[in-house]
Regions:
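Glycine-rich, acidic/polar active-site loops that bind/position phosphate-bearing ligands
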Residues: 1-344
């Protein structure tokens, strides 16, 4: 069974009261009164959970700034892994809940990929795991399993065309730039936020960390390897949720169908920050993600047969996605607006 969960990022925009100003771009897990919308997020989470959404937790995010008399505060609600169809449903309903509550309280809520240059954009990271008979197949003997590496290889192969489902308007490609909490190249790694597919904190340790910190607690024997996922970091709030999650399922399946999957996984693995100057040689050999909707459409055109296989995507649907992306005519937009913050 293919399971997934999303990390739903959004900005809340409201008039600036001038009180307890947060530090610019330092809003990660900030508390009140510097974070202004924790209670709003908590209420959103309550309603989402009442609709059946399975939530892990919520918190304020990196993006936090003021502009022209308004506060822009980024928040995130992170879900728990569920069957992929359910994952899409709960993200869709969550966006509906957040927008409606924002309207009720007079807040402007946006899931836009990028608001302005130099500030963190809003992504929609998707975590995935493969289950069989109730057991997580992502780890074996304490390390990432062959199953997981093949799934990652499929995502490496189809990463350029997945942007057609997960990055669907021109502002998406202003987010996919170095040093802005977003990926730029096709690679993966452990606990590495410069990569496209990240393997989060490993759960292979056979210690109950809670009892280490709290010696009087009764030791738990929960199998923590059940928590292991891999995280696709390119998608954003413009994504068509159902197309995106279907596309990721196709990509992981593709990893089991290609002969050189493990070699591809080995070739695209990195264990350094690829955007640091000392690692520029490594960066040069990695394929780049598309830099526009037009480029994304071209990638989907080249790889469409894989998505149409087994009738997961119809040819008419792929045609429509390609046509919509190309209609933006944004092939040179990112280069044209480079350094022109006001025009952006």
């Amino acid at each position: 069974e293919f399971q997934a969960m999303g990390e739903l990022e959004y900005y809340v925009i409201a008039p600036d009261t001038g009180m307890f100003e947060a530090t610019d771009q330092r809003g990660y897990h900030e508390s009140g009164p510097y974070a202004k919308f924790n209670e709003f997020r908590t209420q959103c989470m309550s309603y989402i959970s009442q609709t059946g959404g399975q939530i892990k937790y919520g918190h304020s995010e990196v993006g936090n700034f003021t502009l022209e008399g308004y506060i822009y505060e980024q928040n995130e609600i992170e879900f728990l892994p569920v069957p992929v169809e359910q994952a899409a449903d709960q993200l869709m309903i969550a966006k509906w809940v957040i927008r409606n509550l924002g309207f009720k309280y007079g807040y402007n809520v946006t899931f836009a990929p990028k608001i302005t240059a130099g500030k963190a954009g809003s992504g929609l990271h998707v975590h995935m795991r493969i289950m069989q008979d109730g057991k997580n197949q992502m780890l074996k003997d304490g390390i990432l399993s062959e199953t997981a590496r093949k799934a990652i290889a499929g995502m490496m192969e189809l990463a350029p065309s997945i942007t057609a489902f997960g990055n669907t308007n021109p502002t998406s490609y202003f987010r996919l730039v170095p040093h802005q909490e977003a990926p730029t190249n096709v690679c993966w790694g452990d606990r590495n936020r410069s990569v496209l597919v990240r393997v989060p904190l490993g759960w292979a340790a056979k210690k109950d960390m809670c009892t280490l910190a709290n010696p009087l607690e009764t030791e738990s024997y929960f199998d923590t390897t059940q928590k292991q996922t891999v995280e696709m970091r390119s998608p954003d709030g413009s994504a068509d949720l159902y197309q995106l999650l279907a596309g990721l399922a196709v990509a992981c399946r593709h990893g089991f169908e290609i002969e050189n999957a493990l070699e591809l996984a080995e070739k695209t693995y990195v264990n350094v920050n690829i955007h640091q100057k000392e690692n520029e040689d490594k960066l040069k050999v990695l394929a780049q993600l598309p830099d526009s909707c037009v480029a994304s459409a071209d990638c989907l055109e080249q790889q469409r047969a894989i998505f149409e296989q087994y009738n997961v995507f119809s040819s008419a649907m792929i045609d429509g996605i390609i046509r919509k992306l190309r209609n933006y005519e944004d092939k040179t937009l990112r280069a044209d607006l480079d350094g022109k913050q006001q025009e952006m």
